[in-house]
């Protein structure tokens, strides 16, 4: 099994925490570092959340704080879904884990420039850190093996009728990434909403046990409430974790190559990922877009990672 080297760029966030849990434990993933961006909440809160998850699960991977603001637009947060802390629900022990002193953007640039072109970037929040790194040092572009991101939709948005939250939170950054020429894989809402975490799934992870099972339960029981109140869903989709699933085994997710463009015009479609599903524009595809996921396979993978945190001694 190939071990994929990745940098996980996230804005924790309930589903981000599940992505961290999976990426740090599965043997197919070599998690080099975790970079944090503002998104689901402000940077001070998302950073604390990322550190809390790492401390709770004893994940010894360096964590770097990144961009506190979008490139251009006024900052927004998703407190309607993730609460005031950005990770409401779990109760953590007093935090002793600290972030690295290096800025996340510098870490991304330095790590890529020193690499053999074998590192995959996995941004599952707004694309601010990735876009700024690309603009600061364009020489990183050929060094990026692939970008596997959570964001966008070829159908309906979730923050506006047109736009998904991660892209809407920094459309200009997304525009930079989608025009970069780097190989892109997009896990949008059309796919990620197929991973609704029902009470049955939560009970399954509770039975699996260990610290990750406990954390999963605390996290996803909170989103049961907010996702139903906001979207009428039967549970919280674990949007970000689909990227980790794809990296572990892309055969579990069906994708379609499309030309994708981010709308940065101020108007009702601001932040929309315009996906040319039928190829009517005649432009070459720049993105593999997630279409369907094998949910039985996916939840089995999540459970495998949860069980990996159970100590046997």
UniProtKB/Swiss-Prot annotation:
Entry's family note: Belongs to the IUNH family. RihB subfamily.
Cofactor note: Binds 1 Ca(2+) ion per monomer.
Chain sites annotated for binding Ca(2+): 11, 16, 124, 240
Keywords annotated in UniProt: Calcium, Glycosidase, Hydrolase, Metal-binding
Single Gene Ontology MF annotation: purine nucleosidase activity
Protein's UniProt keywords contain Thylakoid: no
Described purpose of this protein according to its UniProt entry: Hydrolyzes cytidine or uridine to ribose and cytosine or uracil, respectively. Has a clear preference for cytidine over uridine. Strictly specific for ribonucleosides.
List of residues binding substrate: 227, 239
Organism of origin: Escherichia coli O157:H7
GO biological process: purine nucleoside catabolic process; pyrimidine nucleobase metabolic process; pyrimidine ribonucleoside catabolic process
Catalytic activity: a pyrimidine ribonucleoside + H2O = a pyrimidine nucleobase + D-ribose
Subunit structure: Homotetramer.
Active site: 11
E.C. designation(s): 3.2.2.8
Cofactor requirements of the protein: Ca(2+)
Domain of life: Bacteria
The protein's name: Pyrimidine-specific ribonucleoside hydrolase RihB
GO CC terms in record: cytosol
Gene: rihB
Keyword field contains Hydrolase: yes
């Amino acid at each position: 099994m190939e071990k994929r080297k990745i940098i996980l760029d996230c804005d924790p966030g309930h589903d981000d925490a599940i992505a961290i849990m999976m990426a740090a434990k599965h043997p197919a993933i070599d998690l080099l570092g975790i970079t944090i961006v503002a998104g689901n909440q402000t940077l001070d809160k998302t950073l604390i959340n990322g550190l809390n998850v790492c401390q709770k699960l004893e994940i010894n991977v360096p964590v770097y704080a990144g961009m506190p603001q979008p490139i251009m637009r006024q900052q927004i947060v998703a407190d309607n879904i993730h609460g005031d802390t950005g990770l409401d629900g779990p109760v953590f022990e007093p935090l002793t884990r600290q972030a690295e002193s290096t800025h996340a953007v510098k870490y991304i640039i330095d790590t890529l420039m020193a690499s053999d072109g074998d590192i995959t970037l996995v941004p599952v929040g707004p694309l601010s850190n990735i876009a700024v790194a690309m603009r600061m040092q364009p020489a990183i572009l050929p060094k990026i093996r692939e970008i596997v991101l959570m964001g966008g939709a070829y159908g309906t948005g979730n923050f506006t009728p047109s736009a998904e939250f991660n892209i809407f939170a920094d459309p200009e950054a997304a525009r930079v990434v989608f025009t970069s020429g780097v190989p892109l894989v997009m896990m949008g809402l059309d796919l990620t909403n197929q991973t609704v975490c029902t009470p049955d799934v939560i009970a399954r992870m509770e039975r699996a046990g260990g610290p990750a099972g406990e954390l999963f339960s605390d996290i996803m029981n909170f989103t049961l409430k907010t996702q139903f109140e906001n979207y009428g869903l039967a549970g919280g989709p674990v949007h970000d974790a689909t990227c980790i699933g794809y990296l572990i085994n892309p055969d579990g997710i069906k994708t379609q190559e499309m030309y994708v463009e981010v709308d940065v015009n101020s108007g009702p479609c601001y932040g929309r990922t315009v996906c040319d599903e039928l190829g009517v524009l005649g432009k070459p595809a720049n993105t593999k877009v997630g279409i369907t996921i094998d949910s039985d396979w996916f939840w089995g993978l999540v459970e495998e990672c949860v069980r990996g945190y159970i100590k046997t001694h």
